[in-house]
């Protein structure tokens, strides 16, 4: 079963607390999502393989390290996942970005896919699916399944805030996928929102409902 990584870095926790506050406005919320995403990208890529390369510095020839292995891809789940993309791109500016569009049925809380655009070389990439919230887990489960259907073999999931119910569902349906979180909260409420959570991330990111 895929591991769950919850980051306790002081900067991440501090920024998450400000993000959670009901009085935090759209501009600051957007900036915080971007900042926490960059910090998470730094941690998630810690295990990337390295290879030795010979370079010439202004002083001498030297053997140094560069990232090796498969190319990376980021796939935000629309729309809220878009808020995390720039934070990841600051750390990994050359990665390709796919998109998966899902909306949640207000009655069943289950997701429905309406858009999918992936790099043409899916089988040659390690993917990081990004979505600020992991609530019921339905959107993440479907997004991961869509990637696998198109040939993806290595997938990670990065979320700012998660409920145990969502984590358990992803682990049950995709045990090969590692999950990376800035916060693991208490539970879901009767409306499918994470408690204490941070509200509707998409609404708070874009200022619309």
Curated annotation (Swiss-Prot):
Annotated uracil binding sites: 194, 199-201
Entry's Gene Ontology BP terms: UMP salvage; uracil salvage
InterPro entries hit by this protein: PRibTrfase_dom, PRTase-like, Upp_B, UPRTase/APRTase, Ura_phspho_trans
Pathway(s): Pyrimidine metabolism; UMP biosynthesis via salvage pathway; UMP from uracil: step 1/1
Keywords: Allosteric enzyme, Glycosyltransferase, GTP-binding, Magnesium, Nucleotide-binding, Transferase
Family (UniProt): Belongs to the UPRTase family.
Native source organism of the sequence: Exiguobacterium sp. (strain ATCC BAA-1283 / AT1b)
Reactions accelerated catalytically: UMP + diphosphate = 5-phospho-alpha-D-ribose 1-diphosphate + uracil
Cofactor note: Binds 1 Mg(2+) ion per subunit. The magnesium is bound as Mg-PRPP.
Protein name per Swiss-Prot or TrEMBL: Uracil phosphoribosyltransferase
Entry EC number(s): 2.4.2.9
Function statement: Catalyzes the conversion of uracil and 5-phospho-alpha-D-ribose 1-diphosphate (PRPP) to UMP and diphosphate.
Obligatory cofactor(s): Mg(2+)
Gene3D superfamilies documented for this protein: 3.40.50.2020
Pfam families associated with the record: UPRTase (PF14681)
PANTHER family reported for this sequence: ADENINE PHOSPHORIBOSYLTRANSFERASE, URACIL PHOSPHORIBOSYLTRANSFERASE, CHLOROPLASTIC
Record gene name: upp
Binding site for 5-phospho-alpha-D-ribose 1-diphosphate: 79, 104, 131-139, 200
One term of GO molecular function: uracil phosphoribosyltransferase activity
Free-text activity regulation comment from the record: Allosterically activated by GTP.
């Amino acid at each position: 079963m895929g591991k769950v990584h919850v980051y306790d870095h002081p900067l991440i926790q501090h920024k998450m607390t400000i993000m959670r506050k009901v009085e935090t406005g759209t501009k600051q919320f957007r900036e915080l999502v971007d900042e926490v995403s960059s910090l998470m990208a730094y941690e998630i890529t810690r295990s990337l393989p390295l290879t030795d390369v010979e370079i010439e510095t202004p002083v001498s020839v030297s053997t140094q390290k560069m990232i090796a292995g498969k190319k990376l891809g980021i796939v935000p789940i629309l729309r809220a996942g878009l808020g995390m993309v720039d934070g990841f791109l600051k750390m990994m500016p050359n990665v390709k970005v796919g998109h998966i569009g899902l909306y949640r049925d207000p009655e069943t809380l289950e997701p429905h896919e309406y858009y999918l655009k992936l790099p043409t070389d899916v089988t040659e990439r390690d993917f990081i699916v990004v979505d600020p919230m992991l609530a019921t887990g339905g959107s993440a489960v479907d997004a991961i399944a869509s990637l696998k259907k198109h040939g993806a073999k290595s997938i990670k999931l990065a979320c700012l805030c998660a409920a145990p119910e969502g984590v358990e569902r992803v682990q049950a349906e995709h045990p090969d996928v590692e999950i990376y979180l800035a916060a693991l909260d208490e539970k879901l409420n009767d409306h499918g929102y994470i408690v204490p959570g941070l509200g509707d991330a998409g609404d708070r990111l874009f200022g619309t409902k």
